[in-house]
Amino acid sequence: MMFPGLLAPPAGYPSLLRPTPTLTLPQSLQSAFSGHSSFLVEDLIRISRPPTYLPRSIPTASLSPPRQEAPTALADSGTSDLGSPGSGSRRGSSPQTALSPASEPTFLKFGVNAILSSAPRRETSPALLQSPPPKTFAFPYFEGSFQPFIRSSYFPASSSVVPIPGTFSWPLAARGKPRRGMLRRAVFSDVQRKALEKTFQKQKYISKPDRKKLASKLGLKDSQVKIWFQNRRMKWRNSKERELLSSGGCREQTLPTKLNPHPDLSDVGQKGPGDEEEDSPGASLAYHAPPDPRHLLEGPLPASPAHSSSPGKPSDFSDSDEDEEGEEDEEITVS
């Protein structure tokens, strides 16, 4: 070779081209980044990182391959005047190790040393073949700063990415109580529907003992009777509101006030026909309005069994009860 000086990089710039031997990566990092390019952000940050960032548990065996191959690289290039072969074992001798690009695990594939080097780079390095597999993580930087987290039982031994523990319940805490599934629609017989309607005409709200007694008498569940009364009260309140609006009243008359906390439920369920017509002029106007089955239905009815089961009673309740039974068990209040 006629110009051996052209193949060797200047002595003042090798630290800028690639890391010094003091920043030689441990064996675990060599195996982790053996298949990746050297222009990754992690590699560039690692090159400019001072030696204090390296973990304390770096094996000293990772520095032995460059010391063994440094004299052979100097003999091949013919530039033995830059240093003695024994000087490659020192940690600060960057010119000697800069001449052996193929022996370094952090060799830049497209760097100046690779372009000017005469020997082609081998695919696998002896240091990579002799390095044992990592014990816990592929990144030994976790061993220092994340020591208390790695010792936790959440992380498996062969995991290279820190997993999210699955035992934390805070992502599910905001959902609240799990919602029940949709209940099946109950199908009531004519006898059950008439008995429920008869009880509803007596009292709009039924107590728990009476509800359980009625459910056992009709062969129904307590929840079915409860849902039926809720849906029935909702329909009755809506029809009462439409009645007042059609008779020239206002919607606020159906809302509870301080003087009358229960305008719709208590007044209609407890008073007779004469008292209701005298006290509520809006209702009397509605009764003298043109005949409407819905208006006639909402009038106060006596609690006698003969009246509730009379053939002249409108069948609006029985026709629309099936539509109410499919609603949810939550009562919607009109406000």
UniProtKB/Swiss-Prot annotation:
Belongs to the H2.0 homeobox family. Could have a role in patterning the central nervous system during embryogenesis. Has a key role in regulating the distinct phenotypic features that distinguish two major classes of ventral interneurons, V0 and V1 neurons. Regulates the transcription factor profile, neurotransmitter phenotype, intraspinal migratory path and axonal trajectory of V0 neurons, features that differentiate them from an adjacent set of V1 neurons. Residues 56-102, 240-335 are annotated as: Disordered. This is Homeobox protein DBX1. Residues 181-240 bind DNA. The lineage of its organism: Eukaryota, Metazoa, Chordata, Craniata, Vertebrata. It comes from Rattus norvegicus (Rat). Residues 318-335 have a biased composition (Acidic residues). Residues 83-95, 299-317 have a biased composition (Low complexity). Keywords: Developmental protein, DNA-binding, Homeobox, Nucleus. SUPFAM superfamilies: Homeodomain-like. It is found in: Nucleus.
